[in-house]
Amino acid sequence: ALHAQMPSDYGCVFTGSGDYHHLSQLLLNRLPTQQKIQLIICDNHPDNMRYPFGIHCGSWVYWASRLPQVEHVHVLGIGSPDISLKHAWENHWSPLVKRKLTYWNTNVDTRWLNWIGAGRSNRAFTSADELMSAFLAQLDPSLPVYLSIDKDVLSPQVVNTNWDQGEFLEKHLNALIDACHGSIIGADITGDVSA
């Protein structure tokens, strides 16, 4: 029903609270399947968690990784313990093992990914500056980009959200957007404070 009500052409979509980040999945479903894209997500959480009752804000990345038009998913800025050993069993492993999904994190112990054969799907850094520099150095300019930003990736010095927050500053998002200039085919922003 929602699909039929959406315009055929739209710019960046603002989805409100981070509780609704899974609406990105609906927007991705609207993209043509014959054109491969890279999905770049800025989020303090992996949003790749197991959830037995369908899709929600913490599980949508798994479903997005399965879309035929999605060549690769990069989740940048993860600082949440959701990807630590304590929560390893909660993560969907298949997109990580298949190297369809890469976690780009700061200051989280993710050695367990090596133990399951997914070490190459994890990029660990000690700062947001290092993370963004490394990501931009490997960014594939030939693939169109769908960009999804959850404001919880930003430091509390920049913005307040309802979720635990990351270390990114405005300069990190600006550098990413500048690097993707001309390649972005869709975008959404979530993470407003819930009322």
Identify the role of each PLM range:
Residues 1-195:
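Conserved alpha-helical scaffold segments that buttress catalytic/binding sites
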